[in-house]
């Protein structure tokens, strides 16, 4: 089932953006993604699990959390 996962990722430069794009490009099930450095926002669409996307982006070393973490417990 296709779904959208939105993350807040601490990115400070194009190198950060490139690292996030690289890991998402290799992730199975990802159909498309958008990385917005100004908003610190990463939107991923595809047949993916939110926790798996969070863990994959966290591997870049960037501080990562679900976009709307209020009321949710994010496990990293």
From Swiss-Prot:
InterPro entries, per database record: HMA_dom, HMA_dom_sf
Keywords (A to Z) from UniProt: Acetylation, Chaperone, Copper, Copper transport, Cytoplasm, Ion transport, Metal-binding, Transport
Cofactor(s) needed by this chain: Cu cation
Listed CDD domains: HMA
Record's subcellular location: Cytoplasm, Cytosol
N-acetylserine found at: 2
GO biological process, one term: copper ion transport
Major site of localization recorded for this protein: cytoplasm
Record Gene3D superfamilies: 3.30.70.100
GO molecular function terms listed in the Swiss-Prot or TrEMBL record: metal ion binding
Protein name: Copper transport protein ATX1
Gene: ATX1
